[in-house]
Curated annotation (Swiss-Prot):
Pfam family, one: G-patch
Residue segments, region Disordered: 80-132, 212-307
Organism: Arabidopsis thaliana (Mouse-ear cress)
Alphabetized PROSITE patterns for the sequence: G_PATCH
Motif Nuclear localization signal in this chain: 305-312
PANTHER family: G PATCH DOMAIN CONTAINING PROTEIN, G PATCH DOMAIN-CONTAINING PROTEIN 4
Cellular component aspect of the GO annotation: nucleolus
Acidic residues bias (residue ranges): 92-102, 265-295
Listed GO MF terms: nucleic acid binding
G-patch domain sequence ranges: 15-61
Disruption phenotype: Reduced leaf cell number associated with pointed leaves shape. Defects in pre-rRNA processing characterized by an increased accumulation of rRNA intermediates containing 50-ETS, ITS1, or ITS2. Higher levels of 35S, 27SA, 27SB, P-A3, and 18SA3 rRNAs. The double mutant gdp1 oli2 exhibit strong growth defect due to a synergistically impaired cell proliferation in leaves and enlarged cells.
A GO biological-process term: rRNA processing
Protein name per Swiss-Prot or TrEMBL: G-patch domain-containing protein 1
Length: 391
């Protein structure tokens, strides 16, 4: 036994529901109204599409592809005559006899009746594709469709070509041919209305045209490039206020003015400066003042520009001033001292000065070379002494 069809949702009344059975048990029958006097609604609540909230001028979509009822009605109205089918041989013989009798009776030839064939979508599409084929078109029709350009130039182009005298120079021609001036196109040229400038025909020798003072100069690509470069070069010229350039630079909210000084840490750079300045200083200095200055100038401390986190700042020691102080204090008779003795005293007082040398011989050679370059010391073989200030 086939199962009953399931009720469609939201359409009609579900008679198998508990509510319908409860109403039946209470004395209500289908088709009667609700209420005490049965004056209420008799049918079920029908669900409708609520459209009362749509605004004025709402365009409802027209799903024409899903509604084909009109097309079906048109097809039904069409008269379709089906071709006769052959049932048996006897029917065919009888038909032939009838036709022969009719032909004998009728003297005039009967007009053949055209039978309308059933329309099919394949036939419609075939006709469309057949209409797109170009094989059956004539040459004139093809020229009208494909718009082939004719070899004869248009009258507008002819006017421009006739009015312009352009010289096309090739390598085979003689070099003695004079250049002809390129005349401007006619005033009826369409390019003037759009702001174009004629550049000549292909192969013509380019040359600058002299514009008259009364004529208007056109804006070219070079002018655009020059204008861009001029604006970019002077882009920062107007960002500062009046008088700002003449005032000193502002650092941390204060106008800073001063001299820039640099500190040199190498001994070699100091040698050249000492040789020039020491000769002038020795003429004006006394011996008493020289002793005090030497003691103060042995150790000089200078703060570096930037210091690392774990870096220890050590005092800077000048080798020449230290040697001068040692020779004055510990020199023997005649004011002479040996280089070995001077080197050992330097290691005692400032061991870091000559610590770069691995051997003692290299350190003594460097010390001798350093003192020979200075004008304060006199080096005679392995002995050293100070230059006397008395002349």
């Amino acid at each position: 036994m086939a199962a009953p069809e399931a009720p469609v949702k939201y359409v009609g009344i579900c008679k198998d529901s508990a509510a319908f059975k409860l109403m039946k048990s209470m004395g209500w029958e289908e088709g009667e109204g609700l209420g005490k006097d049965k004056q209420g609604i008799k049918g079920y609540v029908r669900v409708t599409n609520k459209q009362d909230t749509s605004g004025v001028g709402l365009d409802k979509p027209n799903p024409w592809a899903f509604d084909t009822t009109q097309f079906d009605n048109i097809l039904k109205k069409l008269k379709v005559q089906a071709a006769p089918t052959k049932t048996s041989k006897n029917d065919d013989d009888s038909d032939k006899e009838d036709e022969s009798e009719d032909d004998a009776v009728k003297s005039e030839p009967a007009k053949l009746k055209t039978v309308a064939k059933v329309t099919r979508p394949q036939g419609r599409y075939k006709r469309r594709e057949k209409g797109k084929l170009v094989n059956s078109y004539s040459s004139k029709d093809l020229e009208g469709i494909l718009v082939k350009r004719t070899e004869d130039p248009s009258p507008a182009v002819c006017d421009i070509a006739d009015s312009m005298d352009i010289e096309i120079i090739s390598e085979d021609q003689d070099a003695s041919i004079k250049e002809q001036k390129i005349e401007e196109p006619s005033s009826n040229w369409w390019g003037f209305k759009s702001g174009f400038v004629s550049g000549g025909l292909l192969g013509a020798k380019s040359g600058k045209k002299k514009l008259k003072a009364s004529e208007r100069k056109m804006f070219s690509e070079n002018d655009q490039e020059n204008l861009y470069n001029m604006v970019q070069d002077k882009a920062t010229a107007g960002k500062q206020g009046l008088g700002i350039k003449d005032r000193p630079k502002k650092i941390a909210g204060v106008r800073y003015e001063g001299k820039k000084t640099s500190f040199d840490n190498s001994d070699d750079d100091d040698d050249d400066d000492d040789d020039d300045d020491e000769e002038d200083e020795e003429e004006d200095e006394d011996e008493s003042e020289a002793d005090d200055d030497d003691k103060d100038s042995v150790i000089e401390s200078s703060l570096p520009a930037k210091r690392k986190h774990d870096e220890i700042i050590e005092p800077k020691i000048k080798l020449k001033n230290l040697c001068k102080q040692i020779v004055k204090k510990d020199a023997g008779k005649g004011g002479f001292m040996k280089l070995k003795q001077l080197k050992s005293l330097i290691d005692e007082q400032a061991p870091s000065v000559l610590s770069e040398f691995s051997s003692r011989k290299d350190a003594i050679a460097y010390l001798k070379l350093k003192l020979e370059r200075s004008g304060k010391f006199v080096v005679e073989g392995k002995k050293i002494s100070l230059v006397s200030s008395k002349k």
